[in-house]
Amino acid sequence: MRSWRVINHPNSFQGNLKKKNYFEGWYNKIVSGDEKSIFAFIPTIALNKDYSTSHCAIQFFDGSAGRVEYFKYDLSEFENLSELNYKIRIGNSVFSENGMNLDIDRNGSKIKGFLRYTNLIRWERNILQPGVMGIISYFPMMETYHGIVSMNHTVDGILRINGDKNVFDNGRGYIEKDWGSSFPSSWIWMHSNHFSNRNLSFTFSIAKIPFLNLKLNGFLCIIWNQGRFYKFTSYSGAKILKLDIDSTVVKFIIRDKRYILMAKAIKGSSFDLRAPKLGIMEGHCIESMTSKIKIKLLEVDKNPDKYNLIISDFGRNAGLEIMDKNELA
């Protein structure tokens, strides 16, 4: 059984520097108010069997320009700054739930600035759902654990990237994290918080999960709309009625007792990011941050042939990863 402190504070650093074949990373997506700057910063720790190749890093993804950088640091430059919350340091940069203070001078690139996060929309936790994985959060030795730090928040501040000024006044952000030994063999992930309704955020992921001697599909879909969460998960009894996947389009329908969700994601320009395999950052993750997502949420009426429309909206600046090896559909 995993420790209560770790389970009850999933946003904080879950590992320790003595682990082997272990990774942990926080995905910080930020979009400027004018939507011209679309970035992701991913502080990561990668612990291998061979300590000499273990390291920490900051992966930077410019979704508009298609630029990916992997800034590597010695393990001694990693510091966990809180046992209860997401707050870490890599080199001279600090990442937390309150924002990012960036000071990167690596690989011929310079990124400096401070971004402040406010109005965070946090996952609603309880004893049965300490994190987005629900009761599965208590299971030891899972290949990958997944968490959401903030579904949606306001981003303010200025970043200078190689001298270019990027202003994030009234921007929008999203933070999630993964930790474990490796990314799944197959997965699909998508997210957007840029809908016509500013108080709407959506994320969906499905992955092939090894459990005991089986390989199962596990999925998670969360909508935050006007202050309310709608959750569809494999552990809550929701069912995927339809899942169509090709290299650029994903369509699915999910249903539980009260709601039906229909979604279609169309992939934008995509680029290759590093992903973990047994703690080694040698895997691949092909991601777009300029994709589009159409969602429709219906409530099932007492009359089984009647439905009430709750949401019908179109998301832009969407993150999308289609990494299926014909295992999911």
What is the predicted role of each segment?
Residues 1-329:
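Structured soluble/peripheral alpha/beta segments that form catalytic or ligand/cofactor-binding pockets
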